[in-house]
Amino acid sequence: MAFDIPSLKDSVHPDEWQLRVDLAACYRLVALYGWSDLVFTHISAKLPHSVAGDDHQFLINPYGLMFDEITASSLVKVDMACNKLHDSPFPVNPAGFVIHSAMHEARPDAGCVLHTHTRAGVAVSAQAHGVLPISQQSTFVLASLAYHGYEGVAIRDDEKTRLQADLGQAN
């Protein structure tokens, strides 16, 4: 589906524009590699201090666009209260906001958060024991791996604290 989305290039800070371009490219790469899951996955990027100052703001995909449709100008800029900070015809994905605002709040040093449903990730998450230390590759990630039990679609703000607690300090 084609959308007539006007360019934001000349109306945002150059640092924001570059972040938008990079994040849109990331979305396209995730689509290319088959890591997206219709509209049920999301990627966000924290806006730099040069754009947001001391406010915590991030860019996230608009709800309803597939990853291969996302452009730099279609990304939605939000604050930590889910207020859209620019005029956009697209809503914010509620689950995307809950997950990403929780992660950006817990990890202010993280510039980008990717939530994907890769086949391998889904297969591991379906196993009661998760990743087992049965190969060199699996032991590489064990120390920085965290699990959060599925509670349904993450649309309630009260899930943020549990997500943050499960994330812990290792990630």
Show the residue positions of the predicted features.
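Glycine-rich flexible loops
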Residues: 1-171
